[in-house]
Amino acid sequence: MFEVKRNSRNIQEIHLQFNSQKDIRKLLLLSDIHFDNPHCDRELLKKDLDKALEDDAGICIFGDLFCCMQGAYDPRKAKGSLLPQHDGPNYFDLVVEEAVEWWRPYANNLILVCPGNHETAIMKRQEIDLIDRFTTMLRMVEPDCNVSAGGYGNWMRVYCAMHGGRNSFTIYSH
């Protein structure tokens, strides 16, 4: 389907091989999912991700997979915005563990997950990298998963090759 080369945390290459001009390769590009927020439409998200599986599409998340505004020291917190399954003294662990289980069916299609302003705020206030923890745990439970944790400002170069010829395009996220 695709080969991923990680040049650094902020620079990745995706190599797509095409056998004919009729070949189609798809990428699902997502951002601002806020998975742990009660307002996240998980039903619609599942529908989109199931379609990506059906199409054998690569999946990239460009920031704010998590909301995670209910932790200690977060001035934005409001316990009314906390899902019951995340109500515990290990709030961040509960959020990431649930996310890993929920995303397992899509693990082999996940290419890249980048932090957004929510995850970088958590790193600043709580000294925990939710994206690195999520991608590491996903690779542990799904041996064929090759997802990378990207950077806040991220460059992804997509190379499309067919019969010795090659074309490319760049996706920048911030």
What is the role of each PLM region?
Residues 135, 140, 162-164, 173:
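Active-site-proximal loop/helix segment associated with metal-binding centers of metalloenzymes
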Residues 15-25, 35-148:
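Core catalytic region of metal-dependent phosphoesterases/phosphodiesterases
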Residues 12-18, 153-163:
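Short acidic-hydrophobic surface loop/beta-edge motif
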Residues 5-9, 146-151:
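A short catalytic or substrate-binding loop motif that flags glycine-/basic-rich loops and adjacent residues
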Residues 109-111, 152-154, 167-169:
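Generic beta-strand structural signal
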Residues 25-35, 167-174:
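Active-site-proximal beta-strand elements of phosphoester/diester hydrolases
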Residues 1-17, 23:
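Short glycine- and acidic-rich boundary segments immediately preceding or forming the N-terminal edge
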Residues 115, 160, 171-174:
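Short, structured patches in soluble enzyme cores that scaffold and shape functional sites
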